[in-house]
Amino acid sequence: MVNSVVFFDITVDGKPLGRISIKLFADKIPKTAENFRALSTGEKGFRYKGSCFHRIIPGFMCQGGDFTRPNGTGDKSIYGEKFDDENLIRKHTGSGILSMANAGPNTNGSQFFICTAKTEWLDGKHVAFGKVKERVNIVEAMEHFGYRNSKTSKKITIADCGQF
């Protein structure tokens, strides 16, 4: 299986921040990577475009992917509401690692987070399935709009997304 590359065009309160590209590890984690890829392209009729990063914790991560409710309580995958953890072989080794947000084992949907630091305590609990390939500095810039309580000071939006 080919490791796809997707992109997110990020805005802050409607103003462009930049484009990040993300390599998906479809060779090792195909089901999870395909879910993220399809939600990036919108080919199933629903997508990340227009959704926001609702939770940003500096020195930890930026979380988004709730396109059903913009507050972090919604989740929908291309396989239905939730799907099982595919495998937990990839580690949260540092800034730029893409991982599934979940509410416990086998509760993956659409929500994801991008690490801004090494987060080894998440190893074995969250499926890491990609890495920011270009412009990790955009993700690091997003951190400036987050607080320790996970709230954001500005609206950070995925203005556009797709596959290269």
Swiss-Prot record:
Protein purpose: PPIases accelerate the folding of proteins. It catalyzes the cis-trans isomerization of proline imidic peptide bonds in oligopeptides.
Miscellaneous comment text of the record: It is one of six related genes or pseudogenes found in a cluster, thought to result from gene duplication, on chromosome 1.
Protein name: Peptidyl-prolyl cis-trans isomerase A-like 4C
GO BP term, example: protein folding
PANTHER family reported for this sequence: PEPTIDYL-PROLYL CIS-TRANS ISOMERASE, PEPTIDYL-PROLYL CIS-TRANS ISOMERASE A-LIKE 4C-RELATED
EC number: 5.2.1.8
GO molecular function: cyclosporin A binding; peptidyl-prolyl cis-trans isomerase activity
InterPro entries, A to Z: Cyclophilin-like_dom_sf, Cyclophilin-type_PPIase, Cyclophilin-type_PPIase_CS, Cyclophilin-type_PPIase_dom
Catalytic activity: [protein]-peptidylproline (omega=180) = [protein]-peptidylproline (omega=0)
Domain PPIase cyclophilin-type: 7-163
PROSITE patterns, per database record: CSA_PPIASE_1 (PS00170), CSA_PPIASE_2 (PS50072)
SUPFAM superfamilies given in the database record: Cyclophilin-like
One GO cellular component term: cytoplasm
